[in-house]
Amino acid sequence: MAAKEVKFGNDARAKMLRGVNVLADAVKVTLGPKGRNVVLDKSFGAPTITKDGVSVAREIELEDKFENMGTQMVKEVASKANDAAGDGTTTATVLAQSIITEGLKAVAAGMNPMDLKRGIDKAVIAAVEELRKLSVPCSDSKAIAQVGTISANSDLTVGKLIAEAMGKVGKEGVITVEEGTGLQDELDVVEGMQFDRGYLSPYFINKPESGAVELENPFILLADKKISNIRELLPILEAVAKAGKSLLIIAEDVEGEALATLIVNTMRGIVKVAAVKAPGFGDRRKAMLQDIATLTGGTVISEEIGLELEKTILDDLGQAKRVVINKDTTIIIDGIGNEINIKGRIAQIHQQIEEATSDYVKEKLQERVAKLADGVAVIKVGAATEVELKEKKGRVEDALHATRAAVEEGVVAGGGVALIRVAGKISNLTGDNEDQNVGIKVALRAMESPLRQIVINAGEEASVIANNVKACEGSYGYNAYTEEYGDMISMGILDPTKVTRSALQYAASVAGLMITTECMITDLPKGETPDLNNSGGMGGGMGGGMGGMGGMM
């Protein structure tokens, strides 16, 4: 086992605080409408320019292992805030730095660290309750656009684009951000359910000019098996032909004799058919087939539940207003599924999202919800250079997360004003003893730090403006962008309640742990040996010996 280096008490805490300050000082320059960019070196390609707090935090590693422990713990604050709300990472870091700095001063002055932590926790619980009372719902597109604009560093076009996307696909809809090819931002909306599977044969194409298959009011056969024998399909093909409609077959695969016969029938005009593979693999494929069945009012024909293709009747088939199939994608528009069944299916998937532990699984489940809800919107970000494109894409993604959070829990006055008001409302809060009261004061002082940092980044005097804002009430605050005071909500400066709440809770959680740290242990750097208590004696002995030798001469 490798030798360890151990530090105790104030020595350990001082090292840890240095690490916290390095990371927080790098992150907090990005806060607010006049926050600066941070340039991140990459081992290959051009450097990345960003204003995203968590992206800056992830890049920081310090050589000193004790300082690096402090850095890593604050990095956790930014990361957790990002995971919970998708934004507010810089605010969380600023709050954590303030709580840690003031808390460690109190510990050095002889306060009990555990009581300090209890005081901080008590203040945060009360603050979160007050935040919820201040929160107002965010449902109209104007408020959504304002939240998006603020989060995208006061970029009005981004805010409007996100509001438009949400208006078209609904609050449950999937909105993705991609790198565009032009200079302008674009919004591309796909209505209905789309999945990444195209036609199994180009002979199904009935729109040569677009290279697509288009079926109007088709029946939809869903089969959880490979179909290679045409005899299994004959009864249902005859029934569809008699009904005078077209047919879309979605199965694990359609091959051999079955596929050949479908192509011949289509080319001769006997019955208009198209076949595609079912999306996904394994259990996910079964789930997605069931989603399509719910959307189209059909039944998945599966031998697992005793259903056979040969005995399929028209009532087992789903229906949709229109289906468009390209080489790589299939879109089902306006399925006739029962609205109550669709909502039930969405609720079931939401339950799975809550239970999922993997981000990848959550993302895939969220996509399924969107496909059942209102469709998919793609925001294509445009810029002049690749470096600008990457920076802008990051801002748009942050803005998108912020608007989702705003729709979920509502909004409060932005620019750090909400936390100032909350601190004012709980200023009379007391703990069980004097040390807890100090902990409460530490938390209340920290709640001013986001406003102060926004003002500092705008080049103004933080104390003067903070005192002016504290002297007022409601959503009155300071607009650092226009350098004027006013009603933040009227000026469209809004923060999602969830973002502010998450930032405060995660900052207090990690800061509380750091304040109560008494000992730090890390591996000793290679090539070094720990200081031994008798090393000074050895040096003295050698010196004495040398002196004696000189005397002899």
Curated annotation (Swiss-Prot):
Record key words, sorted: ATP-binding, Chaperone, Cytoplasm, Isomerase, Nucleotide-binding
CDD domains in UniProt: GroEL
Alphabetical list of Pfam families matching this protein: Cpn60_TCP1
Subcellular location: Cytoplasm
Function statement: Together with its co-chaperonin GroES, plays an essential role in assisting protein folding. The GroEL-GroES system forms a nano-cage that allows encapsulation of the non-native substrate proteins and provides a physical environment optimized to promote and accelerate protein folding.
HAMAP family, sorted: CH60
Name used for this protein in its record: Chaperonin GroEL
